[in-house]
Curated annotation (Swiss-Prot):
Protein name in UniProt: 4-diphosphocytidyl-2-C-methyl-D-erythritol kinase
Task performed by this protein: Catalyzes the phosphorylation of the position 2 hydroxy group of 4-diphosphocytidyl-2C-methyl-D-erythritol.
InterPro entries with a match to the protein in the record: GHMP_kinase_C_dom, GHMP_kinase_C_sf, GHMP_kinase_N_dom, IspE, Ribosomal_Su5_D2-typ_SF, Ribsml_uS5_D2-typ_fold_subgr
Provenance organism: Burkholderia cenocepacia (strain ATCC BAA-245 / DSM 16553 / LMG 16656 / NCTC 13227 / J2315 / CF5610)
Family: Belongs to the GHMP kinase family. IspE subfamily.
Amino acid sequence: MTDSTRSLRNCLAPAKLNLFLHITGRRPNGYHDLQSVFQLLNWGDTLHFTLRDDGRVARVTDVPGVPEESDLVVRAANLLKTHTGTAHGVDIEIDKILPMGAGLGGGSSDAATTLLALNRLWQLDLPRAELQSLAVKLGADVPFFIFGKNAFAEGIGEELAEVQLPTRWFLVVTPRVHVPTAEIFSDELLTRDTKPVTIADFLAQQTSDAGWPDSFGRNDMQEVVTRKYAEVAQVVKWLYDVTPARMTGSGASVFAAFHSKHEAEAAKAKLPASWNGAVAESLNEHPLFTFAS
């Protein structure tokens, strides 16, 4: 990342994986209670921010299918501007590589990177807790990226506790299908009563010989998604013939973990040509973690 008084360039908005995802209940307002472990990846969209003196917030990159006014990045910048009353504006460029509807947190991570970067560029110096409170207004996953550490998540995803995870390499395969999260949450066959676990349960398993992402819990959404979307089911089956695999979030991406980059790249090389695969290393901390205190 490059840093100056008038711009911040090459700011990574890291993807996330759900190492497991349990749905433990449903609230009267329709929201679901979840338990999950969020894993940051050293892979994602890249954002560039340039200070404007006229107070305008402008996205200067076209993002197909996402109007500027509804883009979470623009909404995040305007939210921060309104909250603080700053006179500054910003031009935002986005190098978009994460697919939408993939369960990788792309839009949420972009929004969080925007809040963190503008906290620095606009010299606001807001504390992390205040940024997290703003982030909730943008989506349930955004506070995690502001939190900035791998985390055990509960509630609707906003109750976060840091977890230490070993370094791993992941192969992430994304079928050419968009899975609407709301559709999966509303499916009548979705499991909503998984017995709650504790962070101690997860950590004990991680330190055992079997401590691998596929060996704790499950993704409660995976059965519904693979029933509805044959492409996702095909990826899960193909990867399972190579190594244990699991869907992240509400899909459509599926991941497998490896001890080394070489192993992950070797598996990627065997993918069918029509599939989109990426190899990424785990992260322990958001690249912009120090932009909030």
